C-alpha cells in the first residue's frame, strides 16, 4: 500500500489515506520518505472539500526570463508533469506572474521570451477555497486547470478539470439529496433506517404543516363542497400540478445558483421568465382540465369547467413564481437554498393552491 501511495499524485494520496482508519493511515505514512510525509501532512491539513485537498503539488513551472525555444526543450525533458496544457511562469521569488497555453508556446518564435507572451491576468484560487467555488470557476471559464496560490502569490499546486468533474458530480448529488429532503450524505444507501429517518424528518414535517394548512382551508369551505361535490374531485389535480411546476422552477434556480448561471442582479428577469412559463403551461392544462370538467360533471354548474380551468392556471402561475422567488430570498438571507427550498415550496403551494381554488370558485359559482 505504501508503494501505491508513493506513486500516486498528492491529491490522490490524501484521498486514499482519508478513507482508511487513522491507525492504518498513520502506519502507511511512516513508511514514506520525509518529503512525501511533509507534502501529505500539508495537504491533509487543509479544510475538507477545499481546493487544498484537491490540488496536485507536482506542477511544471518555467522562469519568465527564458525563451520559448528553451521552454520547449525543458518541457521535452519532463516526465510525468501534471497538466502541461498550461505552463505556469514564475519570477525570481517563485511568485506566479503569468500563464501560457501549450498551443501559444509552440506557435511562438523560439527567441521570444516567455514574459513577452504570457497572460498576466491569472484566475487563481486559495487553498481554503471551497471545492464548489472551484468547480464554478472551472465551469464558467472552461479552464483545464486552476492554479492554487498562497498569500504571497507562490504556486502551491493546481486543481485539474478531471478532479473538478468529480466535485461537480458529488455536489450535484448532495444538492439533489438535500432538495429531496433525504439528507446530504452521498452514501445514504449505506446508512441505517434510523439515520435515514432522522435525515428526512424535517422535510416531511414541513410537508405535514402544509397539509394541515390546506386541510384547515378546505374545512372553511365545507359548505361550498356540500353544495357542489364535484369541486372536491379536482383538489388533488390542482395541488399536484402546482407542486410539480414549483419543484421544476426551484430545481432550475438552485442548480443555476450552484453552477454560477444565476447571477445577482438578474433576479427580476428570471422571475418574469418563470411566470411566463407558468402562464403558458397553466393556460394549456387549464383548457384541457376545464373541458374535461365540463363534459364529465354534467350535473354540476355550467361554469364549473371555467372555474377549474382558471384555478389550475392561477395555481401553476403562482407555483412557478413561488418556486423561483423562494430560493432567491433564501440566498439573500444567507440560507442554503438546497436545504430549505423544498420545505418552503411544498408548504406554500399546498396552502396557496387550495386557497386560490376556493376563492375563484366562490367568486364565479356565487356560493
Question: For the regions a protein language model found, what residue spans apply to each?
Answer:
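Active-site His/Glu-centered metal-binding helix of metallohydrolases
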Residues: 351-352
Amino acid at each position: 500500500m505504501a508503494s501505491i501511495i508513493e506513486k500516486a499524485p498528492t491529491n490522490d494520496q490524501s484521498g486514499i489515506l482519508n478513507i482508511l482508519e487513522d491507525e492504518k493511515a498513520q502506519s502507511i505514512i511512516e513508511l514514506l520518505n520525509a518529503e512525501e510525509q511533509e507534502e501529505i501532512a500539508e495537504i491533509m491539513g487543509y479544510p475538507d472539500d477545499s481546493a487544498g485537498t484537491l490540488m496536485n503539488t507536482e506542477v511544471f513551472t518555467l522562469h519568465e526570463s527564458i525563451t520559448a525555444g528553451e521552454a520547449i526543450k525543458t518541457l521535452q525533458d519532463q516526465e510525468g508533469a501534471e497538466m502541461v496544457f498550461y505552463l505556469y511562469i514564475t519570477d525570481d521569488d517563485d511568485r506566479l506572474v503569468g500563464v501560457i497555453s501549450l498551443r501559444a508556446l509552440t506557435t511562438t518564435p523560439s527567441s521570444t521570451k516567455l514574459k513577452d507572451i504570457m497572460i498576466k491576468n491569472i484566475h487563481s484560487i486559495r487553498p481554503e477555497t471551497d471545492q464548489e467555488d472551484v468547480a464554478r470557476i472551472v465551469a464558467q471559464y472552461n479552464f483545464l486547470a486552476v492554479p492554487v496560490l498562497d498569500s504571497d502569490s507562490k504556486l502551491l499546486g493546481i486543481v485539474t478539470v478531471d478532479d473538478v468533474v468529480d466535485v461537480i458530480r458529488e455536489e450535484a448529488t448532495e444538492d439533489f439529496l438535500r432538495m429531496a429532503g433525504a439528507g446530504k450524505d452521498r452514501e445514504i444507501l449505506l446508512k441505517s433506517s434510523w439515520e435515514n429517518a432522522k435525515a428526512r424528518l424535517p422535510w416531511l414535517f414541513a410537508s405535514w404543516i402544509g397539509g394541515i394548512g390546506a386541510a384547515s382551508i378546505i374545512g372553511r369551505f365545507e359548505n361550498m363542497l356540500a353544495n357542489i361535490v364535484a369541486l372536491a374531485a379536482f383538489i388533488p389535480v390542482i395541488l399536484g400540478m402546482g407542486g410539480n411546476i414549483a419543484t421544476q422552477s426551484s430545481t432550475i434556480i438552485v442548480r443555476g445558483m450552484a453552477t454560477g448561471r444565476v447571477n445577482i442582479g438578474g433576479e427580476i428577469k428570471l422571475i418574469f421568465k418563470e411566470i411566463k412559463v407558468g402562464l403558458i403551461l397553466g393556460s394549456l392544462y387549464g383548457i384541457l382540465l376545464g373541458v374535461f370538467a365540463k363534459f364529465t360533471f354534467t350535473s354540476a354548474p355550467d361554469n364549473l369547467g371555467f372555474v377549474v380551468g382558471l384555478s389550475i392556471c392561477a395555481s401553476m402561475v403562482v407555483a412557478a413564481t413561488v418556486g423561483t422567488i423562494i430560493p432567491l430570498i433564501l440566498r439573500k438571507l444567507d440560507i442554503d437554498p438546497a436545504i430549505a427550498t423544498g420545505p418552503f415550496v411544498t408548504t406554500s403551494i399546498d396552502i396557496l393552491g387550495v386557497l386560490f381554488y376556493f376563492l375563484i370558485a366562490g367568486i364565479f359559482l356565487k356560493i
